[in-house]
């Protein structure tokens, strides 16, 4: 199985409390476990249980993004304990209707919510996208009633840009442009 790495080697970022490591095939089982929690899946899958086939497809897409684009989601690991916290990072949204299709996002196990980890990891992902990958704009999307994610978007500097309907569901979108 392709692990998404290139001859440049896997990418790892560190923050004060997290290790953000390039997505690997072994992360799939943890990803399925993450979305077994209905509260985690609530905004991503509109209240439906996430099927393991869909999560397998998503994980494979993350590996392809790392291989082809040298960016993608990171597995977020707690530095103190080594625990798998969730996914934080960049994701190319091929279905996005505009030219800027790279999104910053996060999905964390519920026990890690409310600690500022999405903010910390989101900022690191933005620095990586702008600094290492030279992106000019990074977007983020959420369900309109996902106030926690919208709050993180604002805390890391994204500004509200409007709404779109994607796959029959309304989403709000935010963006931040590279400065300098």
Task: State where each predicted segment sits.
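Conserved acetyl-CoA-binding loop-helix of GNAT-fold acetyltransferases
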Residues: 106-108, 114-128, 147-155
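GNAT-family acyltransferases
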Residues: 1-111, 124, 128, 132, ...
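Short linear Ser/Thr-Pro motifs
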Residues: 15, 140, 148-149
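Charged, low-complexity surface patches
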Residues: 55, 118, 142
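Conserved active-site alpha-helix within GNAT-family acetyltransferase domains
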Residues: 83-84, 145-161
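Conserved GNAT acetyl-CoA-binding A-motif
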Residues: 132-141
């Amino acid at each position: 199985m392709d692990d998404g790495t290139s001859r440049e080697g896997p990418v790892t970022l560190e923050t004060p409390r997290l290790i953000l490591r390039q997505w690997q095939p072994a992360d799939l089982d943890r990803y399925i476990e993450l979305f077994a929690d209905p509260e985690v899946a609530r905004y991503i899958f509109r209240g439906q249980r996430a099927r393991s086939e869909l999560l397998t497809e998503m994980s494979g897409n993350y590996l392809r993004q790392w291989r082809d684009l040298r960016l993608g989601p990171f597995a977020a690991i707690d530095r103190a304990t080594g625990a798998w916290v969730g996914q934080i990072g960049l994701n190319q949204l091929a279905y996005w209707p505009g030219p800027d299709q790279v999104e910053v996002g996060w999905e964390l196990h519920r026990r890690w919510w409310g600690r500022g980890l999405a903010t910390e990891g989101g900022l690191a992902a933005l620095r990586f996208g702008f600094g290492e990958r030279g992106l000019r704009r990074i977007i983020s999307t959420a369900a309109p009633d996902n106030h926690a994610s919208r709050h993180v978007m604002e805390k890391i500097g994204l500004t509200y840009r409007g709404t779109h309907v994607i796959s029959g569901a309304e989403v709000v979108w935010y963006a931040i442009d590279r400065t300098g």
